[in-house]
Amino acid sequence: MLEFFMETAPTTTTGLPLSAILAIFFSFIIGIVFGGMALFVFRGFIMNRQLRIAQRKATKMLADSKVEAKDVLVEAKREADKARNSAEAELKERRSELAKQENRVMQKTEALDRKLENLEQREQSLTNREKSIDETQSQIEEIRTAELKRLEEVASMTTEQAKSSLLEMLEGEMQQETSRRLREWEIKIKAEADEKAREIVSQAIQRCASDVVTETTTNVVPLPSDEMKGRLIGREGRNIRALEQATGVDLIIDDTPEAVTISSFDPVRREIARQALSKLIIDGRIHPARIEEVVAKAKEEVEAAMIASGEQAAYQAGVHGLRPEIIKVMGRLKYRTSYGQNVLQHSIEVAQMSGMIGSELGVNVTLARRAGFLHDIGKAVDRDVEGTHTQIGADMVKQWEKSPEVIKGVAEHHFDTPTVSIWGFIVSAADAISSARPGARRESLENYIKRLKALEEIADSFKGVEKSFAIQAGREVRIMVKPEEIDDLGAMRLARDIVKKIEDGLEYPGQIKVTVIRETRSVDFAK
């Protein structure tokens, strides 16, 4: 057929016959059709194959799932059995525990029942005993009332009188017992305290060697002759008035041969007047202008001497780093005395003693020395400022010292404050050692006699005292008491009361011994 088309078909411009072209076209179409059919068949084959593979996989997965499900089911059954067994065991254990608790509760209930029964029995017994006791007490009260009536009839005393007598007797016995025990404790405590104090003081004294100082400020200036008295007085007394006005002292020119007495309460003024008067006597030129010049120069020399004395005293006391104001004020104490004892030398001794006592007690030695050295600084200005020298000194030290320990030592060394620290006790002990040793201090005859009379008046003011005597220069008081009014224990109380009144009402150096003497004499005659 193709050949027919090829033979009969006309030719084209390309030279190929139309039939050839149609043959090629039909061949191409047929190839496409057969290729599509082949492709469809092949694709169907492939799809069938994949389908079979998928079916096999699905079958396998289904089988595996069944196996796995079976395993899971078996495991679940096993876990369920295990949980059931555990629950059954726990339930069994709880039932057993509940049974035990029930048994215990029953036992406790039985025990409580028994106790309740016992309590009821005891209550009944106590009720019976209470009735018996009430009956017995009633009988005793009746017997007591009867006996009291009989005693009142026999003793001719009422009940209140008997009670009063018994209380008085008991009070006397208790007072005697209390006094006896107080005496025993007092002896014991004093012995222990004295032993410890002796140890500390002896250690301090062994390490300190100080001079005995009893000097006083010079009040009398010697004159080369009595003619100098007239020159000192001057025409119409102008020289002596100028000298008294420039120095602030009183010059006493009396019948005492070749001597002029300087009188003033201010030791510094007294020293300035002494030096100025000595220079005027040596120079010989005595007139108001010269007096003013010499007095001004004497003031400068005394101030320089005070500073030098203060520095020297601080060096001897082992106290360093003091401010110039303190040095100058301490130098004034060179011209200040207390009961005849030079206060500056006393301050040096107290500083040394305080340091040694502080070292024995284990405190700061430097601060102890400093407090001891400054403890009497208030005496340098106590004539110009109101207050005790401890208050004045504490106020002055607060301005220049930062250490509270030093301030406490100055303020508390006379126990003027409500509380006393260890620094106050250290300085007080050192002050007592320096001032109370023999020869350290002395007092005027007038003050001495007043103190003796005051001691005897204090002792005589107590009931039962017959006579008192102040002896040993006022360091001991002996009291004679009436034996019918004061017994032995009362004598102890009397001594303690007198000591307390002396401590509260008198100022004195050192310590005063109080001795109470009770004498009983029994006299009879043989016939």
Swiss-Prot record:
Membrane topology qualifier: Single-pass membrane protein
Reported function: Endoribonuclease that initiates mRNA decay.
Source taxon at top rank: Bacteria
One Pfam family named in its UniProt record: HD
Protein name: Ribonuclease Y
Region spans: Disordered: 83-117
Gene3D superfamilies in alphabetical order: Hypothetical protein af1432, K Homology domain, type 1
Gene Ontology terms describing biological process: mRNA catabolic process
Location relative to the cell: Cell membrane
GO CC annotation, single: plasma membrane
